[in-house]
């Protein structure tokens, strides 16, 4: 049996197969916030009825070859149009009237909410601000080519900074209410360090130096029997894009050792700023915590065995405890069980230590999920120890009352 394979995408792209067999995609690449994105479908169709013809394809005249290729392209286009109609129908089912619809990448395979620091930042912010929302994992980028983006009352906003400004204006929430002018200035400066500098060092570790592990975590739909091939293609395309964008940024012009040195300086700066405080700016939550958590969580849970993971779970243990506090407080369905933080569900035995898939609520509201937060916590777990032999919970990790959230109402 012979198979025909095609790639269908609504975004223009050019495939460059040069002498070194590199592959480059252009046209859908847009900006520093979430550069790695891939949208389209791998479509396969059987050609079993034309086995004899396909066997003799090499000797057929050019017009027959053209006919076969055109037929395959038409089949791919028809399948893609059907997919688009289904997507449109699904989108029509999403009612954004007085509801926040968060568009983001699909959940990865390792139980972490997102491999994207910006998607994790945005979803964590919505939970911190106690704003009910609905996830949509369609994979489609915003009009500006960004991910994540939201819909609210038929308005579409992309870019996490603009999304937060929009929600503050429309819904009156403000996680920075307790910050003074000086603290707000410090918060913005740290945000830019994390998103415009530390982010690129993480991207290098995730999509260049640790690509094979990242590929295992990547979740793709629509690939069918070609899922593994599609995952490999997406990861290597992303690797090339990240390296090219890092070079344009300037940080990619340094050696691997120098990039990791810059990463370590950023992480040490965050650890020094946090100190023994509960949150980055003090005892109260702020928008900065969503930003920092979205990025540190990548080092904590998506980069096994790498330098940033060893650093955060070893020497900079206060950052690990900070991540655990936020994870346990705002992500009750996120149970991560690796060598350092083991959380077992009430139904599971001590021997079962497998990744628990993320549970996606159709609509998430913290007031519904954390109704017993003041009492003994039902999802507290038994921790393991870090690389130094200290428990990740040697510091304050208990759950707060809702006083943390009164500031954003």
Curated annotation (Swiss-Prot):
A Pfam family it matches: FAXC_N
Record's GO cellular component terms: membrane
Keywords linked to the UniProt accession: Membrane, Transmembrane, Transmembrane helix
Keyword Membrane included in the entry's annotation: yes
Major site of localization recorded for this protein: membrane
Membrane topology (UniProt): Single-pass membrane protein
Parts forming coiled coils: none
Transmembrane segments: 68-88
This protein's record includes keyword DNA repair: no
Region (Disordered): 372-393
Localization in the cell: Membrane
Superkingdom: Eukaryota
Functional description taken from the UniProt entry: May play a role in axonal development.
Family from the record: Belongs to the FAX family.
Record-given protein name: Failed axon connections homolog
Organism: Mus musculus
Gene name tied to this protein: Faxc
